Amino acid sequence: RICPRILMECSSDSDCLAECICLEQGFCG
């Protein structure tokens, strides 16, 4: 999957860019 390496806080996958998913730590990855 394509995920820009930008540190973004999230509460769900929809908060993240491209194909990033929301990881357990509360950040996109």
Curated annotation (Swiss-Prot):
Cellular location(s): Secreted
InterPro entries for this protein: Prot_inh_squash (IPR000737), Proteinase_amylase_inhib_sf (IPR011052)
UniProtKB keywords: Disulfide bond, Knottin, Protease inhibitor, Secreted, Serine protease inhibitor
Site residues (Reactive bond), renumbered to this chain: 5-6
Major site of localization recorded for this protein: secreted
GO cellular component terms, A-Z: extracellular region
Family (UniProt): Belongs to the protease inhibitor I7 (squash-type serine protease inhibitor) family.
Organism superkingdom: Eukaryota
Disulfides per UniProt: 3-20, 10-22, 16-28
Keyword field contains Disulfide bond: yes
Domain comment (free text): The presence of a 'disulfide through disulfide knot' structurally defines this protein as a knottin.
Protein name per the record: Trypsin inhibitor 1
Stated role: Inhibits trypsin.
A single GO molecular function term of this UniProt record: serine-type endopeptidase inhibitor activity
SMART domains, per database record: PTI
Secreted recorded as keyword: yes
Gene3D superfamilies: 4.10.75.20
